[in-house]
Amino acid sequence: MKFFLGSALFLILTFINLVRAEFEFITPAEDSRWARGFTYAVKWKQPTEQFVEIALQYADSNNTLITSSGVIPSNQTYWMVKIDKKWLMKMDNITARVVAVPQNGTASTVYVGPQVLLANTFYWKMVVDVSPAFSVNPIDKKLAIGLSVGLSCCILIVLFLHFATRRERRILKNEKELEMSSYRKH
């Protein structure tokens, strides 16, 4: 008896999950921000029904309809919606919900999708990790100045020695030329 109840419960929960997973939204993400005047796409995985209707409704207790897509054939898995100013009802922000109603000829089930925030303006939401102000260690600053001055002086000394001893560093082709040149001078 215990085994039968456990397997029956498993089958019921599996059926509930299958019914809930029948219609799955891909976009928008939960709590997305949709700005007035912009066009957004509502995408979903292809359902088993022939036709589907997607709607945007206010997330209040009345579930007032904002706009609807009309009947969409099953081979189309997106709906483009442009946010209108009158949907905001003279407010700055308002929460809406995307819903789907598969049209299968019988009593249709309403599948509730993600909530979106309809907004009057568009902005990027940036999350900035605030770290403490960057402080320069005075020893590091002195070390950087000292190293750069010291290396510059070394380079200048090497260049000076290179150009100052240029005549003494000549390489002669062979030793006889050296002897001949010193013999003629005497």
UniProtKB/Swiss-Prot annotation:
Entries under InterPro entries matching the protein? Pma1
Write out the entry's keywords from A to Z: Glycoprotein, Membrane, Signal, Transmembrane, Transmembrane helix
Do the record's keywords include Membrane?
A: yes
Alphabetized Pfam families for the sequence:
Psg1
> What domain of life?
Eukaryota
Gene Ontology biological process: endoplasmic reticulum to Golgi vesicle-mediated transport
Q: Name one GO cellular component term.
A: membrane
Tell me which residues are glycosylated.
N62, N75, N93, N104
Tell me the residue ranges located in the Cytoplasmic compartment per UniProt: 164-186
Q: Span of the secretion signal?
A: 1-21
Q: How does it sit in the membrane?
A: Single-pass type I membrane protein
State the compartments where it is located: Membrane
Name the record gives this protein: Uncharacterized protein C21C3.17c
